[in-house]
């Protein structure tokens, strides 16, 4: 049958206008007679025509058609690139494939308009959209393929492609609003493959972190993994950060989640640090860290600033250690500063003042946890500032908190009264046996004093100060180092087997000898004209460097994950000492190379060692050559 015969039938098939509500509800054909149609007149009801047409939804399969277009463009462009050997940066030509896709798009759009016209209605957008545009990428089509290897930056659709200006972003979906039948709430991210990309993994040993660390969903861990991480914490983290009572922790962890409060932050910080020290948890390490950081930020925003819980300070402490070891030193240093301010806000430096918290009726285990949290932050303050030679935050002279109790008494919650740090430093040289944690605190106190002495020396030289003040202060520190430092080393070195199994003992022994080197390097910079004093101290410093080398050989027996994480600090001091002398005395070169090799080995799991190597490389451009020689 010819089209001329069909045309009148098609046009007269349905009257102009909209069907009334009664006919639409009964699904009857409305004759559209006004004011009352035939159906309503026969039923005796009021005829109410529907004057507002409901907007039409998207056509079925439209999104699949859009995806197939992009895939066709990718295949076409990749085929042309393989055939012609063109560069990836060229723009794709508009070829037959592109015309075919345009025809498909136009026919699809025309089909929508024809159907609307047949129903007697036209969407408002169709008046100005006679010819719909084709989705044309603003970048090369191999760039679309590269979409699978790049993550969003700041906005969901902005991408930085290889070989382009990173400051200029492109939007692959910038023209989607031109399609009238596109769903209004389309989220194109649902069609972008969610894969780990170079921007979301470690780059040059450092995390490229997202800018938004807010907590959007719960980071779910299986219960078995949580238990494994908790026990891994007490096995590998607690030996160098002994601030939690194991029995009290598991009792608090058994409470319902709704009653834990800041304990949730502490748990995630513990698990984050434990995941770093367990190779089986590397796949969750970064995600767990990001979630923990966001959890802490969210908790602090809702926290009452006058009474922060102790768990928050402990979580901040663990997170700062993790960032120093696994993210980068600067980020960890800044996080440690926030932890120190929180410690000061809680007044943990004066726990044992008269009528203080120690006399408030709180259990010994809880008070001791607070003491140990403060002393761990105090030690961390010395650890991190020995690297960059920055001023200390926690002042030794205002501390009114007793030294930690022995580990056995702490875990069994048996009250033991210990000395104050000032009493210990001012007492006689006949020291009783102290715990490894207390010994480390004493050694780091001496190191902090030597660091302040070095900084004060630089200021005095800038202002033309008299060297006599420097000599008096230097001799006083040397006397403390010879008495307290030597007594501590002798005390913790009685049992060599414990020194091998306890990372705190091994680190404290190395740190005590490194303090001797720090004091010696300060003397060289401050008393360059006093050869007699320098030569006398040179012998003691050389002996200390040899002892560090001897202790360094035991690191391999501990394993990567049981070495004290701040062990690179004494190693870098020893390497700097040998580096300044190997040119005059070749006997120091093996010592220097051994320190470099140890730092390089530790850098596999510890970014602080990598930071120390970078510091040595800045002062000695030939260090790479030295490391190559030491490996051969």
Swiss-Prot record:
<dbReference type="GO" id="GO:0009893">
    <property type="term" value="P:positive regulation of metabolic process"/>
</dbReference>
<dbReference type="Pfam" id="PF00172">
    <property type="entry name" value="Zn_clus"/>
</dbReference>
<dbReference type="GO" id="GO:0000981">
    <property type="term" value="F:DNA-binding transcription factor activity, RNA polymerase II-specific"/>
</dbReference>
<dbReference type="GO" id="GO:0008270">
    <property type="term" value="F:zinc ion binding"/>
</dbReference>
<dbReference type="GO" id="GO:0006351">
    <property type="term" value="P:DNA-templated transcription"/>
</dbReference>
<feature type="DNA-binding region" description="Zn(2)-C6 fungal-type">
    <location>
        <begin position="20"/>
        <end position="47"/>
    </location>
</feature>
<feature type="region of interest" description="Disordered">
    <location>
        <begin position="77"/>
        <end position="130"/>
    </location>
</feature>
<dbReference type="InterPro" id="IPR007219">
    <property type="entry name" value="Transcription_factor_dom_fun"/>
</dbReference>
<keyword id="KW-0238">DNA-binding</keyword>
<keyword id="KW-0805">Transcription regulation</keyword>
<keyword id="KW-0804">Transcription</keyword>
<dbReference type="InterPro" id="IPR050815">
    <property type="entry name" value="TF_fung"/>
</dbReference>
<comment type="function">
    <text>Transcription factor that regulates the expression of the gene cluster that mediates the biosynthesis of azaterrilone A and other azaphilones, a class of fungal metabolites characterized by a highly oxygenated pyrano-quinone bicyclic core and exhibiting a broad range of bioactivities.</text>
</comment>
<keyword id="KW-0479">Metal-binding</keyword>
<keyword id="KW-0539">Nucleus</keyword>
<protein>
    <recommendedName>
        <fullName>Transcription factor tazR</fullName>
    </recommendedName>
</protein>
<dbReference type="GO" id="GO:0005634">
    <property type="term" value="C:nucleus"/>
</dbReference>
<dbReference type="InterPro" id="IPR036864">
    <property type="entry name" value="Zn2-C6_fun-type_DNA-bd_sf"/>
</dbReference>
<dbReference type="Pfam" id="PF04082">
    <property type="entry name" value="Fungal_trans"/>
</dbReference>
<dbReference type="GO" id="GO:0003677">
    <property type="term" value="F:DNA binding"/>
</dbReference>
<keyword id="KW-0862">Zinc</keyword>
<dbReference type="InterPro" id="IPR001138">
    <property type="entry name" value="Zn2Cys6_DnaBD"/>
</dbReference>
